[in-house]
Amino acid sequence: MYTNLIFIFKIILEGIIEGVTEFLPVSSTGHMIILGSIIGFKEGAKPVSLYGAEYIHMFEIIIQLGAILAIVVLYWDKIFSALKPSNLFPSMKEHEKSGIGVVGEFFVKGYNTMPGFKFWTNIVVACIPAIVIGLPFQKKIDKLLFFPAPVAAALMVGAVWMIFAENKYRKRAKIKSVDEITIKQAIVIGCFQCLALWPGMSRSASTIIGAWIVGVATVAGAEFSFFLAIPMMLGASLLFLIKNSVVLSSVQILGLAVGFIVAFIVALVVVDRFISFLKKKPMRIFAVYRLAIGIIVLVLGFTKVIS
């Protein structure tokens, strides 16, 4: 009984950290490494080894889904509107002789006249770079870089880059809405998202910086980052669940449910306040925080507290 209570307590802590950090430009990975090492909730840690590495991976997937659900709830009107057939499919009553064919005309007309078509097209093309690089190389990247020193380096490099990019590009950014983002800008932002394959860099930070560089304002860049997370995380979760089957005990199932709910509720609050913050304040405070966390990860790694 006592062991189960301790387990649920650890689950709650993990859910809170996931909900707080998943969509902030501070790297949820860095925080999960620190917390997991301290409380013994990581692969190979004795208190959790009873539950197995597969369960830990599944738990990480499930709490990410909780955070994703928060985005779906907060932006339901936008997502639902973009899925309406009236906003998604252009009318092609007449075939115009444009030299690009029916399919080309359908795409061009849809992109230029249908908000939903444009929205999902931008999301899809922005996801392609990370899929192309991530699918074949993610395991190799993690094997090389999923250690305290590389994660700390990513945290600190990202912090310096964030300060530089904000000072140079933020004031130039004129695109204030996700609906104004062009397909070229979406592709570039998607390429920047690939930097998050380096553990500790932060997908949110990478995409927001990429958005600044191509002229997209902070709030629009952050929201586009949120929308990108939906297919990326759902896809990664589905892939993991297809490849792995785990027989769960009642306590393990309870742990998944609690972690999911905690991550959902915390992310719901954090994302809403994060957007309000970005409307008024610069992001350098997150850069300073990243530097501090990077130093902590380095020290803990050097002293063998985390590994």
Curated annotation (Swiss-Prot):
Membrane topology, as annotated: Multi-pass membrane protein
GO cellular component, one term: plasma membrane
Molecular function in Gene Ontology: undecaprenyl-diphosphatase activity
Transmembrane segments: 19-41, 56-76, 117-137, 144-164, 208-228, 229-249, 251-271, 285-305
Origin: domain of life: Bacteria
Keyword Phosphoprotein: no
The entry's keywords: Antibiotic resistance, Cell membrane, Cell shape, Cell wall biogenesis/degradation, Hydrolase, Membrane, Peptidoglycan synthesis, Transmembrane, Transmembrane helix
Principal EC category: hydrolase
Main location as per UniProt: membrane
EC number(s) per entry: 3.6.1.27
Family annotation (HAMAP family): Undec_diphosphatase (MF_01006)
NCBIfam families linked to this entry: PRK00281.1-4 (NF001390), undec_PP_bacA (TIGR00753)
Task performed by this protein: Catalyzes the dephosphorylation of undecaprenyl diphosphate (UPP). Confers resistance to bacitracin.
Family: Belongs to the UppP family.
Protein name, per record: Undecaprenyl-diphosphatase 2
Species per Swiss-Prot/TrEMBL record: Clostridium acetobutylicum (strain ATCC 824 / DSM 792 / JCM 1419 / IAM 19013 / LMG 5710 / NBRC 13948 / NRRL B-527 / VKM B-1787 / 2291 / W)
Gene: uppP2
